[in-house]
Each structure stands twice: as structure tokens, then as C-alpha cells.
């Protein structure tokens, strides 16, 4: 999604932090005089070099191996792109470096946004996507933005959708278990063990967000929160939007909903079966019960309450993708 927001406006210098494969910076090289990619994971560097050569941008793009701004000295940039590690991970979990955002998910993100003051030019812009835990009202990230940047930066944050912190923790439990190469049923034990962590961080939801920050003159900052999230309950009735206007394609690991030849959503098999049952009459709970009667294996790894909650959260994502709406 971050690459979709790379504009065609010509700029001098672009920075891609937490570069990963380097895709953001490589795409930005088409409109920039120079691009710097920063990546801390040494194992990723050969892949970045390959992608640079593959796209014939080696004359514009340089790689710096290190942590965030540390290799950059006092360099400043016109644009900064970041897809950072943002997953909130309780202490003691063995979790992939690519996703581990610390106990509240903001360890890396706070360092990134605080660096905008030093490394972003006046009228320069920074873009970030990710997930952030928060209260029922908003993610904790917004409070950090207010404290750190709101006086001298024009901030726009779009909240796409939100899902329960419990669902986030269960998903993270399975990732952590995979890292430890333990039995799959241990994920349930780990999930129960870390329910206390949910209370400690005082989080209710996980928010998916898109952030744009523009450096202004001193004292001319502002913050705008665009909340597109909607909470679905078991009693809501989903309705398909222009169901004849899209196609479903099957891939080895997932299904894709396409409209006008463009993928607008990726689905697992359970969500696809759920969508096919939407008739504009049944509630989410009724669809779940209908699916259970037809297929005993449908989301059977979750208790009923959590399974319905998972489908409700899927409805929030499908609503953002303009696939369904509430009756």
C-alpha cells in the first residue's frame, strides 16, 4: 500500500527506512535524483541489491546497513517512506525482527517520528503505514504524534479499520509458536498466559493506519484524524456491493477478489465461504451458524464467540475495500 502513495512529483532526495526488499525506494527512484535505503537485517541486503540491479536504478540508489537514522549523520530528505515493525509483542516472546514493534508496538515508530525533525526538509513529507494498538476511541500512536510533532508538522492519519486486541494476540501467538517450533496447541496456552498483558497495556483495539506528515514552519502544525473504522457486531446484516462487478481468483495460499483486473482484497477460505453466504438477510451470527451446519471444520480452531468476532472484523476490512456494507 505504501508504494501506491508515491507521487510523481520530482524531488531531490528520498529516504526509505526499514527498507525490507527496497520496493518503496526503488519505485521512488523514478522521480528522485537520489534514494537512500536503510535496513538493519544483514540477510536482507543481498535481496535489496538484486532488486536494485533488476530495476536498473543502481546509479540513483544506495544502501546503508544499520538502525534507522544512525548511518545517515545529518542528512536531510524531501520524502521519507517507512513500513516499520509495528506488531505489539509482549516481553519474552521470540518474534521475527521484521514485525516486532516492542511491547506497545511503538518502540521503532517513536524513534522514526522523532527523527522527522532532524532529517526532513521544510515542506518535506513523510509517509508510513502500519498497525497500532489503542483504546476504543483511537490508537496510542495519535497521542505520541500530538506530543512529538503537532506544533511544527501538518499531520494526517487515516484509520482504515480496527480489530480486537484479543484477535491480534491470538494471531501473534501462532507466529511466536512457529518461531519456537512448538506444537500448535501450545498457542492456546500462550494466548491464555498473556491475557494479563492485554490488561497491562490497557488496549482494546488494533488499528490499521496510513500516516502522512509534512514539515511546516515553526508553530504552523496541525493534526487531522480521519476515522474510517466501523465496528460490526454479530447482529449486523452484511450486504454485497455490486457483487457482479468483481471476480474471485484462486491462488495456492489464498483467494483474491478482483475488480476491473485489480486485486482489491485477499481472503482465506473461511472468509470466502462467508462472503458466498451473504444474502442481505442473514446476520453475521446466522451466517456463521449456517456455515457450521454445512462444514464442521469452519473456523473450528476458535470458540464460537471468537469465531464470530473474527468474522465481524473481516466485515470491517471488506467494508473498507468497498465489497460489503451494512444493511
Task: Write out the residue ranges for each language-model feature.
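Short amphipathic alpha-helical segments
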Residues: 49-50, 92-95, 113, 139-142
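Residue-level signal for inorganic ion chemistry
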Residues: 2, 83, 112, 287
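Conserved Class I SAM-dependent methyltransferase catalytic core
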Residues: 41, 106-161
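A generic alpha-to-beta junction signature in SAM-dependent methyltransferases
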Residues: 72, 119-120, 278
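Long, charge-rich, low-complexity alpha-helical segments
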Residues: 34, 263-327
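Conserved SAM/SAH cofactor-binding pocket of Class I
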Residues: 1-73, 79-82, 88-89, 133
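A mobile, often basic/glycine-rich helix-loop segment
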Residues: 92-111
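Rossmann-like AdoMet/SAM-dependent catalytic core
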Residues: 153-273
Amino acid at each position: 500500500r505504501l508504494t501506491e502513495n508515491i507521487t510523481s512529483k520530482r524531488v531531490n532526495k528520498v529516504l526509505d527506512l526499514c527498507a525490507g526488499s527496497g520496493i518503496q525506494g526503488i519505485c521512488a527512484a523514478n522521480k528522485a535524483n537520489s534514494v537512500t535505503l536503510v535496513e538493519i537485517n544483514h540477510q536482507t541486503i543481498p535481496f535489496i541489491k538484486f532488486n536494485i540491479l533488476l530495476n536498473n536504478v543502481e546509479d540513483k540508489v544506495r544502501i546503508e546497513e544499520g538502525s534507522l537514522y544512525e548511518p545517515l549523520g545529518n542528512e536531510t530528505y524531501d520524502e521519507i517512506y517507512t513500513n516499520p515493525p509495528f506488531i505489539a509483542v509482549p516481553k519474552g516472546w521470540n518474534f521475527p525482527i521484521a514485525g516486532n514493534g516492542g511491547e506497545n508496538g511503538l518502540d521503532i515508530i517513536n524513534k522514526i517520528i522523532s527523527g522527522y525533525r532532524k532529517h526532513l526538509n521544510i515542506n518535506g513529507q513523510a509517509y508510513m503505514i502500519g498497525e497500532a494498538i489503542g483504546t476504543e476511541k483511537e490508537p496510542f500512536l495519535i497521542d505520541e504524534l500530538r506530543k512529538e510533532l503537532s506544533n511544527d508538522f501538518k499531520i494526517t492519519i487515516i484509520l482504515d479499520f480496527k480489530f480486537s486486541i484479543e484477535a491480534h494476540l491470538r494471531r501473534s501467538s501462532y507466529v511466536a509458536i512457529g518461531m519456537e517450533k512448538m506444537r500448535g496447541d501450545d498457542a492456546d496456552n500462550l494466548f491464555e498466559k498473556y491475557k494479563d498483558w492485554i490488561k497491562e497495556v490497557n488496549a482494546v483495539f488494533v488499528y490499521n493506519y496510513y500516516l502522512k506528515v509534512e514539515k511546516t514552519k515553526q508553530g504552523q502544525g496541525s493534526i487531522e484524524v480521519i476515522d474510517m473504522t466501523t465496528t460490526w457486531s454479530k447482529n449486523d446484516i452484511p450486504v454485497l456491493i455490486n457483487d457482479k462487478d468483481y471476480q474471485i481468483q484462486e491462488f495456492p495460499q489464498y483467494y483474491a477478489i478482483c475488480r476491473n483486473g485489480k486485486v482489491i482484497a485477499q481472503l482465506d477460505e473461511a472468509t470466502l465461504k462467508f462472503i458466498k453466504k451473504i444474502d442481505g438477510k442473514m446476520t453475521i451470527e446466522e451466517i456463521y451458524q449456517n456455515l457450521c451446519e454445512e462444514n464442521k471444520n469452519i473456523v473450528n480452531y476458535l470458540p464460537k464467540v471468537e469465531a464470530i468476532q473474527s468474522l465481524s472484523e473481516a466485515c470491517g476490512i471488506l467494508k473498507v475495500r468497498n465489497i460489503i456494507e451494512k444493511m
